A protein has these predicted regions:
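Predominantly the C-terminal beta-signal and adjacent terminal strand-loop region
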Residues: 90-94, 173-231
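Positively charged n-region of N-terminal signal peptides that target proteins for export
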Residues: 1-4
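Short glycine/proline- and aromatic-enriched beta-strand/turn motifs that initiate or cap beta-hairpins
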Residues: 20-74, 143, 148-150, 213-231
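Short acidic, glycine/proline-rich loop/turn micro-motifs
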Residues: 48-53, 95-97, 151-157, 200-204
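Transmembrane beta-barrel strands of outer-membrane/channel proteins
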Residues: 34-44, 83-89, 139-145, 175-177, ...
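Gram-negative (and chloroplast) outer-membrane scaffold detector with strong preference
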Residues: 21-24, 70-158, 168, 215-227
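Bacterial N-terminal signal peptides
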Residues: 7-15
Length: 231
């Protein structure tokens, strides 16, 4: 009986050891280890109410071009996670309440009403689902910041308040379709809804602090390297 129990325990231990070794094996997959993406899109924006400078930046819901690039780490099932950034040079109508004084730490000039341009830049953490050969669906989720910089009056190039620009939190969700020319070369077309949340300091209760920015984007995604899994 003792010999039987000893033999049984040895079989259990050996089986457990072999199972642990199998679980620790590393396999190479055909999935890309990284994705590099470049895209161009058109977006609209409603505007920003800035209570600190008593100014409004009206984008007029006009369509403007936006350029995007991302670097993502490949994951399972065609998903990836990484960082992305966009840039757009945006025309807008600047208006300010000149009877409201600027804070002592604010810089830049103001106008009652004038045409101007600014640089709009975003930097986000991005999650992308959908990749591979042939047609496939896409889902994209972003979270990060939007920066409004270089607010300048068109007529004379004067820097408008706030002179240092402004940075707001930004969130985005998108859905679309892609076509894979190969497992590592994809063309994506995606519709996104993005919104930036501006600070409420100095705003009346009825003033909006949300800049809504829907967009359509065409992107080229290229996969590089390889990915391994442990089982």
């Amino acid at each position: 009986m003792r010999r039987f129990l000893f033999a049984f325990l040895m079989v259990v231990l050996v089986a457990g050891s072999l199972g642990a070794q199998r679980r620790q094996r590393t396999y190479a997959t055909n999935d890309p280890g990284f994705w590099l993406t470049a895209g161009i899109g058109g977006f609209t924006a409603n505007g920003v109410n800035d209570g600190v400078t008593a100014s409004t930046w009206d984008f007029g819901s006009a369509t403007n071009f936006q350029y995007r690039a991302s670097l993502e780490r490949g994951m399972a099932n065609g998903s990836s996670f990484g960082i992305a950034g966009t840039f757009a040079r945006v025309p807008f109508a600047y208006s300010a309440d000149l009877t409201s004084p600027l804070p002592a730490d604010a810089s830049g000039s103001r106008c009652l009403s004038c045409n101007a341009h600014l640089d709009m830049t975003t930097l986000v953490a991005t999650f992308h689902s959908g990749a591979g050969a042939g047609f496939h669906q896409l889902v994209e989720l972003d979270g990060g910041i939007v920066a409004y910089r270089n607010l300048k009056q068109d007529s004379d190039g004067a820097r408008l308040a706030p002179g240092g620009g402004n940075i707001d939190p930004l969130f985005s969700a998108g859905y679309g379709f892609g076509y894979g020319l190969s497992a590592r070369t994809n063309v994506d077309f995606i519709s996104t809804y993005t919104f930036g949340i501006h600070e409420r300091k100095g705003l009346s209760n009825g003033s909006s602090n949300t800049n809504r920015m829907p967009s359509l984007r065409l992107s080229l995604r290229m996969g590089f390297g390889g990915r391994t899994v442990t089982r």
